[in-house]
């Protein structure tokens, strides 16, 4: 006898402006309860200290969570100079304090220039990266240091917003897997005084910005007034706007819906595409060159009554 699913079918993406002091999973569970949803997930955790853009996927949208996780991110952060902590942020114990010289903007810019573009970054011990099946932060809490190889990341933008006596405000746009705490610590090391993250706000994730984000308190207020929250959901395909649109109909569409690749003659192209039928979004497909044409391979398909 199959187990009955708890909750209702909810499909779409909700962008939350995560408040400080709570975990991403805590927010996910809270919003999932508000929707009474059977299935939901987030697309990359923010530290409890951090605020900002946290996309949540419901139902069919969870099929694209990995693609969303792989997207570029943007942040605004405050680096507190002169203090290093265990965790690289203000929640960790202080491990070193140094005097902070009076840096000019030109001096800071010269250091920031070293971190723009393709760089190698050693992840923080207080990260969720796994080692032998356990997240690194568990080892760190036990006082165990694990050797971590440097990983390539790209810093598209590293903009100095403000210089104060003991703080720097920075805007960062970067590839997935970039640790802002590690970036700030490395900048502090080159400056010679050390640094940690005292504030962090994510402004972009999976193509969504703060303009798309909702406050959980507003959702709770809507529920108390008896209003439906479903109208706040964005269609799953809005998370895939980095890929071009491609439309199919007839026999090729039927083949794709049955999970079979189709050949598109005379149209050589490659890469992922947002696939649409005659009426609606179908899913994510990958175009592979084949002779003078293209083979279109379904990768993630959504359930939909209208095609």
Curated annotation (Swiss-Prot):
It is an enzyme of class 5 (isomerase). The active site is at 47 (nucleophile). GO terms for biological process: mRNA pseudouridine synthesis; tRNA pseudouridine synthesis. It catalyses: uridine(55) in tRNA = pseudouridine(55) in tRNA. CDD domains: PseudoU_synth_EcTruB, PUA_TruB_bacterial. The keyword rRNA processing does not apply. One of its GO terms (molecular function) is tRNA pseudouridine(55) synthase activity. Keywords: Isomerase, tRNA processing. Its EC number is 5.4.99.25. Belongs to the pseudouridine synthase TruB family. Type 1 subfamily. Responsible for synthesis of pseudouridine from uracil-55 in the psi GC loop of transfer RNAs. HAMAP family: TruB_bact. This is tRNA pseudouridine synthase B. The lineage of its organism: Bacteria, Pseudomonadati, Pseudomonadota, Gammaproteobacteria, Pseudomonadales.
């Amino acid at each position: 006898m199959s187990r009955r699913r708890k909750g209702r079918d909810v499909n779409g993406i909700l962008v939350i402006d995560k408040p400080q002091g709570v975990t991403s999973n805590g927010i996910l569970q809270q919003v999932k309860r508000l929707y009474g949803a059977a299935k939901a997930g987030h697309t990359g955790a923010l530290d409890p200290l951090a605020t900002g853009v946290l996309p949540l996927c419901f139902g069919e949208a969870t099929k694209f969570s990995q693609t969303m996780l792989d997207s570029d991110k943007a942040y605004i952060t405050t680096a507190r100079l002169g203090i290093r902590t265990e965790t690289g942020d203000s929640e960790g114990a202080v491990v070193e304090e140094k005097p902070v010289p009076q840096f000019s903007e030109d001096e800071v810019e010269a250091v920031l220039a070293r971190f723009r573009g393709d760089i190698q970054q050693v992840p923080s011990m207080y990260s969720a990266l796994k080692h032998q099946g356990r997240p690194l932060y568990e080892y760190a809490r036990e006082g165990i240091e694990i050797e971590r190889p440097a990983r390539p990341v790209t810093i598209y933008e590293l903009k100095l917003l403000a210089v104060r006596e003991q703080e720097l405000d920075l805007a960062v746009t970067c590839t997935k897997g970039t640790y802002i705490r590690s970036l700030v610590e490395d900048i502090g090391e080159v400056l010679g005084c050390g640094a940690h993250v005292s504030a962090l706000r994510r402004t972009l994730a999976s193509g969504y910005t703060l303009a798309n984000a909702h406050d959980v308190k507003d959702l709770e207020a809507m529920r108390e007034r008896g209003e439906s929250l479903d109208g706040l959901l964005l269609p799953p395909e809005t998370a895939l706007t980095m890929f071009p649109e491609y439309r199919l109909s007839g026999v090729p569409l039927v083949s794709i819906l049955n999970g079979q690749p189709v050949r598109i003659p005379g149209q050589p192209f490659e890469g992922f595409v947002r696939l649409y039928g005659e009426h609606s979004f179908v899913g994510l497909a990958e175009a592979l060159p084949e002779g003078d044409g293209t083979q279109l391979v379904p990768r993630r398909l959504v359930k939909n009554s209208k095609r």
